[in-house]
């Protein structure tokens, strides 16, 4: 039913957060512009200045802009929507960032790296001000900061629930008690 709200899905949410962080691209892919929709859907540009870190800080234009962003990204990453959860995969996220949103990104897989190198790469990206998109067996999310003690900030994509500062070396997902981070996507 097209009138039922479905979860946006972790892949679309994490990719949208990465794009919001960078405020890029400025122009929407033309294939996603809907001339029969709302003003935000008709817009050929992303309304980054209307989007805020917290939905309580946004007016209707900002909320519509978030909806458009999530919709565009959902289409680009081939989200499969369902009432109990929506899915995609990190390869589609990588393809979408490159082909639809003009990002230069690299895919790094932990399993093919010497011990400690994955950790070092993530820390370096964060220290240089670049958020890191993480994918693991059951969830995708964004690492978006590092503090002076070396703790990393995790945005799980659940409207702030469980977001916080974690010791990267011992970080577990709140979902399934598995060590996270088999794949990362970072800007090149």
Residue ranges and their predicted role:
Residues 95-155:
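Active-site-adjacent substructure of cysteine-protease-like catalytic cores
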Residues 15, 24, 37, 137, ...:
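An acidic- and aromatic-residue-enriched active-site/binding cleft used to recognize and process polar
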Residues 1-6:
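A conserved hydrophobic secondary-structure block that centers on an alpha-helix together
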Residues 8, 12-110:
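Cysteine-nucleophile protease catalytic domains, especially the papain-like/related folds used
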Residues 7-10, 137-139:
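Gly/Ser-rich catalytic serine loop of serine hydrolases
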Residues 127, 147-188:
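Cys-His-centered catalytic/binding microenvironment captured across papain-like cysteine peptidases
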């Amino acid at each position: 039913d097209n009138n039922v709200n479905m979860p946006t899905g972790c892949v679309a949410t994490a990719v949208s957060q990465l794009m919001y962080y960078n405020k890029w691209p400025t122009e929407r892919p033309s294939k996603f512009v809907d001339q029969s929709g709302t003003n935000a859907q008709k817009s050929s540009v992303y309304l980054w200045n209307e989007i805020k870190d917290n939905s309580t800080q946004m007016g209707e234009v900002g909320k519509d802009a978030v909806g458009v962003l999530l919709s565009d990204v959902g289409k680009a990453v081939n989200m499969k929507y369902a009432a109990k959860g929506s899915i995609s995969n990190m390869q589609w996220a990588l393809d979408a960032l490159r082909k639809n949103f003009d990002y230069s990104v690299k895919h790094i897989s932990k399993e093919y790296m010497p011990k400690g190198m994955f950790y070092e790469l993530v820390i370096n990206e964060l220290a240089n001000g670049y958020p890191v998109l993480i994918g693991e067996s059951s969830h995708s999310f964004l690492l978006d900061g590092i503090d002076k003690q070396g703790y990393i900030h995790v945005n799980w994509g659940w409207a702030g629930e469980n977001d916080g500062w974690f010791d990267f070396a011992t970080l577990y997902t709140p979902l399934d008690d598995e060590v996270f981070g088999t794949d990362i996507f970072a800007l090149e």
